[in-house]
C-alpha cells in the first residue's frame, strides 16, 4: 500500500477505518487528506473539471488509474456522472491540489446486478485536480444548442 494509506478492520459486517495523522472526517463520513492544496476557487456544479486519479482497493492495490492510461479524466460537476463521494471530494479541491479520499459505502457507487459493484465497500482514491473550466450553453441552431467550457 502507498504511504499514509488507511487501514480497514473488518468486524463482522462492519468495517472500521483507521487513518494515519492528518486525515479529516466529515459529518457525512467522507474522509480525506490533502497532500497539496491548490489555488483558485472551489469548483461548482456545471463546471468542467479535469483530473487524474488512482483508485485503490482496501489493501492499497491499484485497481484503476488515469496515469496508467496516460490521459486525465474530464467531466462536468452536478450531472450525476460520478460516485457521490468522489464528486464531493473534487468540490472541496482547488486546481493544482492533490488529495487522498476515503469514500464510505453510503457515498459510494450503486450496487446490484446492473452495476460493476456487487457489494457496498469503501473506496480509496488519490485525486489530482488539474483544472476547472466554466461552461455555458450556446445556441448552435434554431432548435439545437451545445455546452461550451472555457478556461
Question: What does each model-identified segment do?
Answer:
Residues 1-151:
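Cross-family detector of peptidyl-prolyl cis-trans isomerase
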